[in-house]
Amino acid sequence: MAKILLEMKNITKTFPGVKALDNVNLQVEEGEIHALVGENGAGKSTLIKAILGEIPHTGTIEFKDTKDGHMAKLKIGYVPQSVNIEKNTPVSVYDLIASYQYNYPVFLPKSKKIEAKIRETLEVFEAEELIDKQVCNLSGGQLQRVLLSMAIMDEPNLLLLDEPVSGIDQNGMELFYKTMDYLKTHYDLAIILISHDLDYVAKYADHVVLLDKTVAKQGTVKEVFESKEFERIFYTGEESWVREEEHK
């Protein structure tokens, strides 16, 4: 039986004039990919920010451990939806990761030990050839692979991904989801993934949470994708009729 890593109770967040989250209750288990799906404005990114402690909210978020009910040291890896990189910043991928991860000054010569560790992590996402490239010259897909590598370097307990495959081509998406499947299995990692790629969610997610400011439906892919709540949010009018015809 999977172990609960994170439990959210009655999470509510209101911005001026807008309720972004309304009594969200959710449990996240180790070794599973939890996909957050829903329309734009459903509160998915807001929920990620609440978990990260970036925004105040009501309700409780509790990180748990198997021994005493609480984690001695929680490590969270996070990849945002987008990152702004100054075009004139002459920093290589090695410099970026070494300075961020190891506080290693960019003006010092390369450390062979640090370089080996960085290269090893980049290899997980088939990005080792990017180690000497200037960050400002990376494509969107290349940058996302570098950010994903940075997110897992500390071997986190929890990995938060806010639409991490935006800007990545089809081959890159397939590699990403296969890598997530590998990480959750080999590191017993809990992954919370925001995604609009429903085909990939159906293929790789262990647990799906349909968010509509509150949890409209959660469960297995089958339970959520075949629910009336999913139908209401994602299929209306002619699209709904087409879907009904497909299932006859």
Write out the residue ranges for each language-model feature.
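Conserved switch/coupling elements of ABC/ABC-like ATPase nucleotide-binding domains
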Residues: 209, 213-223
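Conserved ABC ATPase signature
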Residues: 134-138
